């Protein structure tokens, strides 16, 4: 005997997508954290070819685009839960980040961006000048 969990609403949603050809927007999960003088962002993109990735920054908006190709139409799918086609995600970057020095690496289905904090935004010590005044003997 095999036990199966069923969710009738999920099944109905999947059936509607198959019949009507509608899909929810593809999800591009990410994690982001600060590591010293830089921010690190990782996007999960399993099954995406590195050549289909596109990154651009315009006015402090970082856009990540990716494409996961459609499956062979001759297949009769039993389950198709991974998003297909072109999808994107935008991040709004603060003025305190140096968008000219963003580094991107893609390995094992994870896109990792390293975004340094701008020099002008880093904490710095300000020297205080003090002038010694001599009193005038009156």
UniProtKB/Swiss-Prot annotation:
It holds the Pfam family HSP20. InterPro entries: A-crystallin/Hsp20_dom, HSP20-like_chaperone, Small_HSP. Residues 21-131 form the sHSP domain. Coiled coil: none annotated. It comes from the Bacteria. CDD domains: ACD_sHsps-like. PANTHER family: HEAT-SHOCK PROTEIN 20 FAMILY MEMBER (PTHR11527). Not known. This protein is one of the major immune reactive proteins in mycobacteria. Belongs to the small heat shock protein (HSP20) family. This is 18 kDa antigen 2.
